[in-house]
């Protein structure tokens, strides 16, 4: 299955106007973690918060809805959230922890839960793992190349970034700039080339924009707990949803991109094996 094991797939968006303004797409990550926090399902969440440099995120422990909102929006460079999990449990004393992760981080967290040596009494505290779709991730220096060198902008002027329709989008207060995705090839993290997971197949809930209209997100529930929390949030009016079959561009595009990432990774893994280089699979 190109999308992994799942319970249900819907198109959804937050009903909170403030979250809608802050979020990348439908506000699912922020809204779901905030709901779980308010309901006592979790006591805090590890998220990618703002860093000392513009658009260079740093992992943070969010204990309130306002802190979650401060971390809203996608950052296209790496935030080492997994490193913050131990601190969240041992220094903040969190017994029920939520976190957001890209697919490779999701895999690492599940491995820690399966083989908890070195993170004993930490992995079992994770009660909600929200995964976000990811085709590739860029080093911060690559973002600087795209924005500062190729587009001629200062990082501090950027209000939002996005990837879609074959382009890398950069939004400022006054204008919108685009860069063909082909010009970003070769700048991604090296590990992205051998990663097979586009849709965070091991998360409790996976989400991203692909497959849904602008302002909405495609949400995949994968575990009993993830499915239950999302349904509770919908019943509480936190999200509005539509059947994925009734929206455009629809599930076909998500399946296509997921399959493409798997195929590309398989080819790169085979090439590495031929050269005698290590592979993760």
Swiss-Prot record:
Any Pfam family: FrhB_FdhB_C
Record's keyword annotation contains Iron: yes
Listed EC numbers: 1.12.98.1
Cofactor: Ni(2+); iron-sulfur cluster; FAD
Classification via InterPro entries: Co_F420_Hydgase/DH_bsu_N, FRHB/FDHB/HCAR-like, FrhB_archaea, FrhB_FdhB_C
GO MF term list: coenzyme F420 hydrogenase activity; flavin adenine dinucleotide binding; iron-sulfur cluster binding; nickel cation binding; oxidoreductase activity, acting on CH or CH2 groups, with an iron-sulfur protein as acceptor
Disulfide bonding pattern of the chain: none
Chemical reaction(s) catalysed: oxidized coenzyme F420-(gamma-L-Glu)(n) + H2 + H(+) = reduced coenzyme F420-(gamma-L-Glu)(n)
Keyword line: Iron, Iron-sulfur, Metal-binding, Oxidoreductase
Record text on cofactor binding: There are 12-13 Fe atoms per alpha/beta/gamma unit of the FRH.
Translocase among keywords: no
Stated role: Reduces the physiological low-potential two-electron acceptor coenzyme F420, and the artificial one-electron acceptor methylviologen.
Subunit structure: Heterocomplex of the form (alpha(1)beta(1)gamma(1))(8).
Family: Belongs to the FrhB family.
Annotated protein name in UniProt: Coenzyme F420 hydrogenase subunit beta
Classification of source organism: Archaea, Methanobacteriati, Methanobacteriota, Methanomada group, Methanobacteria
Gene: frhB
